[in-house]
Amino acid sequence: MTELIKKGIAAREASSFLAQATTKQKNTALINLSNDLIANTATLLKENEKDIIRAKEKKTPDTMIDRLRLTEERIKEISEAVKQVVTLKDPIGEVTTMWKNEAELTIGKIRVPLGVIGIIYESRPNVTVDASILCFKTGNAVILRGGSDAIDSNKALMNVIQESLEKSGFPRTSVQLIEDTSRETAREMMRLNRFLDVLIPRGGAKLIQTVLENATVPVIETGTGNCHIYVDKAAEKQMAIDILVNAKCSRPSVCNSAETLLIHESVAEDFLPAMEMALKEYNVELRADKRAREILKDAKAATESDWEEEFLDFILAIKVVDSVEEAINHINKYGTKHSEAIISNDYATGQAFHQKVDAAAVYINASTRFTDGFAMGFGAEIGISTQKLHARGPMGLTELTSTKYIIFGDGQIRN
């Protein structure tokens, strides 16, 4: 019996316990965990430093090292995030609908945990806590597999989580970490159908594609974000510039940042120079098609791969289009079904865009950066789903549940 199968058995047993836990019990445990994270700050920083040293020895880019790094302030933020989950409504046990049928049976539909969730993710140690608390709040056991670059941080965080949950009366195996970061073990996890009810990958395109190609466990794809801003001929110029700068430059390394600008040909000559001036402050590299380069003399020539790329950097691809239909076709060809935006004061054009663009979130006159659980107003999320089953868009607590029918009768039999 492999170590992973042992974890699967333990997780299945823990999930039965978690499914019966009350909201009060879960919230009390989360409050204790929030305090325990602060109490163990010194240990967490010490273990995190091992990952940082190893990353520097490998000459890892500074942006990636920053994602790995824990600080006192970041641990406080993680602790506060745990407290925020306490304030969120527990969806477990919620009756979503109830009715009586012709046989006078009372039929209710209620929310229940998914069971055991597997999560495969990359660098950021905070995901270890985020994923743990969201699954825990919804009564799900979880098995985590983080990246090798954050293994010491993840092990330290997992130790705090497990000890804290145990002190609160919950099984240590409610939350587990796979410490073997080999590809072989990752692939074994992807095929753990006997124990995992769903697998959620969080990371770059390569990780997600590997999971989709190898998993036999049902997968919820938290896809990459090749997001577009389309500036229509009826756009308000300054609004469009402000939205583009926010969508591209506020946090370029996240999946809801804009990667491509599509601009209507009738406003390109006026808009593009003003846009270029606004982006200069951030040293954004522009990669433009032939028509855009006739206006933007310093822009690099865009290649076919640029239309497909999630840059996660200060790089913007630019294409001039003849119509909203051309913009929609480009988005549906190259987009990743994440977040797409149109800037237009024409109601009919906005409606056509949102009806025809295939994406989890479609914006009219707003930045794509709002595709986020907290920004949308429903709290923490486990990722942004770009598929249509079982969830789509930011996955909050509700999306980590399934449903069950409860039927009340008084002796009815079916004729």
UniProtKB/Swiss-Prot annotation:
One of its GO terms (biological process) is L-proline biosynthetic process. GO terms for molecular function: glutamate-5-semialdehyde dehydrogenase activity; NADP binding. Pathway: Amino-acid biosynthesis; L-proline biosynthesis; L-glutamate 5-semialdehyde from L-glutamate: step 2/2. Its main location: cytoplasm. InterPro entries: Ald_DH/histidinol_DH (IPR016161), Ald_DH_C (IPR016163), Ald_DH_N (IPR016162), Aldehyde_DH_dom (IPR015590), G-glutamylP_reductase_CS (IPR020593), Glu-5-SA_DH (IPR012134), GPR_dom (IPR000965). GO terms for cellular component: cytoplasm. The keyword Thylakoid does not apply. This is Gamma-glutamyl phosphate reductase. It comes from Listeria welshimeri serovar 6b (strain ATCC 35897 / DSM 20650 / CCUG 15529 / CIP 8149 / NCTC 11857 / SLCC 5334 / V8). The lineage of its organism: Bacteria, Bacillati, Bacillota, Bacilli, Bacillales. The gene is proA.
